[in-house]
Amino acid sequence: MTTQNFLAEIGTEELPPKALKKLATAFAENVENELNQAGLSFEKVEWFAAPRRLAVKALGLATAQPSKKIEKRGPAVSAAFDADGKPTKAAEGWARGCGISVEQAERLATDKGEWLVHRAVIEGQPTKNLLVDIISRSLANLPIPKMMRWGDKTEQFVRPVHTVTLFFGGELIEGEILGVKIANVVRGHRFLGEREFTISHADEYLTALREKGSVIADFNERKALILAKSQEKATALGGVADIEEDLLDEVTSLVEFPNVLTAKFEERFLAVPAEALVYTMKGDQKYFPIYDKDGKLLPHFIFVSNINPEDPTAIIEGNEKVVRPRLTDAEFFFKTDLKQRLEDRLPRLETVLFQQQLGTLRDKTARIEALAGEIAAQIGADKAKAERAGLLSKCDLMTNMVFEFTDTQGVMGMHYARHDGEDEEVAVALNEQYMPRFAGDELPKSLVACSVALADKFDTLTGIFGIGQAPKGSADPFALRRAALGSLRIIVEKNLPLDLEDLVRKSAALFGDKLTNANVVDDVVDFMLGRFRAWYQDEGIAVDVIQAVLARRPTRPADFDARVRAVSHFRTLDSAEALAAANKRVSNILAKADVAIGEVNPTACVEPAEKALAEAVLGLRTEVQPLIAKGEYTAVLDKLASLRQPVDSFFDNVMVNAEDPALRQNRLAILNTLQGLFLQVADISLLQ
């Protein structure tokens, strides 16, 4: 089988930087899928992406589809010809569908008789004839939320398309994609190298782009270059660059030939909280801040230019000039905000609506204050500090700094609280109330902060569910899924002795008559328990394990987690499968029971197997009670695993539905006790 390398490049206007990597990887995945569906073998598909291009390269792509042997069975010979030996309509219709005459059909002898059959070999198409359609479909299926048209064209894409290049080895593929004729023309850098040049082979692409067009098309190569140079520049300044993965990807998506440079700002700006300065540098300017070895912000930053002049002074000064007004604004807002205490901003919260039916932000802070105090009392935190932090929790939303730099909410509250002389735990809680902000984010460190964070999240969950506005589909305007998962993480990972029903009930009481959903407690608890599924699945825990625990509906998250860990461990034991099947059988038997089931009477047992099981379940019931009380579910299930042999023996040797009612009742009681032992942890009958 002969192969060639295949290249496809789509040259565009500047693509959205935050979406570039996703578009490129999706393009490659789509091409892989299309090649597989076409039956075309290949070694691998590589992807390339720069601000003005998406490209894929399929290495070792077969030059043709493989031939296919087909065999279409027709009617039986007895039904294919009439008494005169002429083909019947059924035979003629089948032959016509195969593109042959009845006389051309072969015969297939089977033990059930003889049949007409059509055998043929369908030659595979040359790969080059399929490539235009493969790329067109791959582009059509990209995850593009908003498409656009350009010029007088009817085609749509994420940005206007100017060039399309498809090479299969050294052959330029003819055709049109997105209204653009395929050509051997590739566009270079906007300002460096050749603006436009031609290539003659798929393997020339990367080298020609770099040498002629001054473009590094390999996204990962540009990313690695930016990272290495940034770290090198930061080290030269005696610091460490703050390079977040998402920002690094975005910066990589903004440049075709990266030039990493450093610039500085006036040291007087360091009097402003570092978070505000960093917000401006990262969010607005896409700069990388630099910190010293003690974690203090340095008056320098790293930026990446898309041009590479011999003297970069003008570029450096230009970036310093651009960032200076933003830092000056931050300095002004900070100094202005310090003139008023956080507590004095409480009345202004009355002018901001949290939700029309649920009142203002001032109403919300009053509820957070009360609920945070309740939670603090339960988890051993300082109640007064939790209430104080709850009261001040939203005051920084009324400051100039947070109004201008919204992502600094919480952290600015912490700085202003410190300036006001608030207790340190109170100040820190104002920042940590929003944790975790995203999946994998750190949790609040102090119990006071945990109290406020949970109070805030439960207030939102209870309030929104209480007015019947639960999330639907992907719509979740109040981020309830994040609030639920964040709450669960705090309770579980901090091992807090909190009950969801209790928290929702207390939260609901604080709304007075504002809530209209009478089932708010059950609705919120069910919603939160449902979030466990996604959490544990991400950890690789089997769905049936989660379902087994959900069936018991434990409402204390730390307890729920302990049960999941225990069942996940139990599932690995040799006896697990047999005991799960036995529990399923027990459930079915008990569901059909036609007598009242009481306590086990050991003296009423007749068969040795039922005596053995009765003794085992009664003994274990006593033995595991202390473990259940302490939540040591793994130890409980380890002990219950010993029931496999007596359970198997019972079902092999004992008829449960005996004719004697007393005997039947006692045997059902044994099974009921057996089931009850496991149900104290989970419904293991649901394990697959």
Curated annotation (Swiss-Prot):
Keyword Ligase annotated: yes
Chief subcellular location: cytoplasm
UniProt xrefs under InterPro entries: DALR_anticod-bd, Gly-tRNA-synth_bsu, Gly-tRNA-synth_heterodimer
Subcellular localization, as worded in the UniProt entry: Cytoplasm
A UniProt-annotated Pfam family: tRNA_synt_2f
Keywords: Aminoacyl-tRNA synthetase, ATP-binding, Cytoplasm, Ligase, Nucleotide-binding, Protein biosynthesis
Substrates-to-products reaction catalysed: tRNA(Gly) + glycine + ATP = glycyl-tRNA(Gly) + AMP + diphosphate
GO terms (BP aspect): arginyl-tRNA aminoacylation; glycyl-tRNA aminoacylation
Ranges that cross the membrane: none
Enzyme Commission number: 6.1.1.14
One GO MF term: ATP binding
Enzyme class: ligase
The keyword Cytoplasm appears for this protein: yes
Annotated signal peptide: none
GO cellular component: cytosol
Assembly with partners or alone: Tetramer of two alpha and two beta subunits.
Stored PANTHER family: GLYCINE--TRNA LIGASE, CHLOROPLASTIC_MITOCHONDRIAL 2, GLYCYL-TRNA SYNTHETASE
UniProt similarity note: Belongs to the class-II aminoacyl-tRNA synthetase family.
Name of the protein in its database record: Glycine--tRNA ligase beta subunit
Species in which this protein is naturally found: Actinobacillus pleuropneumoniae serotype 7 (strain AP76)
